[in-house]
Amino acid sequence: MPDHSQFNVEHTYPGMWTITFSNPPINMFVPTTIVELGTLMADLEADPCLKVVVFQSMNPDFFIAHLDVSKAAERPEVLGLWREFVLRLSSTRVVSIAKIRGRTRGIGNEFVLACDMRFASRQTAIFGNPEIGVGAGRRRAGMAPACGRPLAGTRDRAQRRRFRC
């Protein structure tokens, strides 16, 4: 498994990985993050023993801040890679869980919606869409439409019942 600069991968238990975002100071997604997530997705799909992956943040104030649009403009191909990653994550056999503490905005919202389950801290979780403030909806901004899945979609509810959460 390759080293990643934007997050740490820990094989927590047999069949379970914990991915910890660590891109200080605010866990902003940059093109490198998206490329590395694509590599991570290939690793997840290639491990037949993997059952669960938990995504969390090292920073208690930010889960995923947002996309650095100035850097993304330099590499427009990453938006296609992002769409591919979100769709693969939402349909993989591995159960994906977002453990949310702190702010989650823009691309971070799309990320957590692609996960099968999401658990947010009542004390610190804050969700926001900065695209709205600049008049750019997700589709016009070129971002993936959160897989068309509502926040509490049927797969999410089914997984919670399955695991008795």
Language-model regions, residue ranges each:
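Hydrophobic/aromatic residues within transmembrane alpha-helices
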Residues: I19, F55, D68, F111-L113
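Conserved CoA-thioester-binding segment of acyl-CoA-metabolizing enzymes
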Residues: M1-Q56, P60
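Glycine- (often His-adjacent) and acidic-residue-rich active-site loop
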Residues: V35, C49, S57-R88, T104
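Generic recognition of short, well-ordered alpha-helical segments
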Residues: P31-T32, L67, E110, R139
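A short, flexible beta-alpha/helix-coil linker loop
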Residues: N23-I26, V69-S70, A125
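Catalytic-core regions built around general acid/base machinery
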Residues: L40-D43, L81-R93
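Crotonase-fold acyl-CoA enzyme core
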Residues: S90-C165
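Residues that form or flank phosphate/diphosphate-binding pockets in enzymes
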Residues: M28, I64, I107
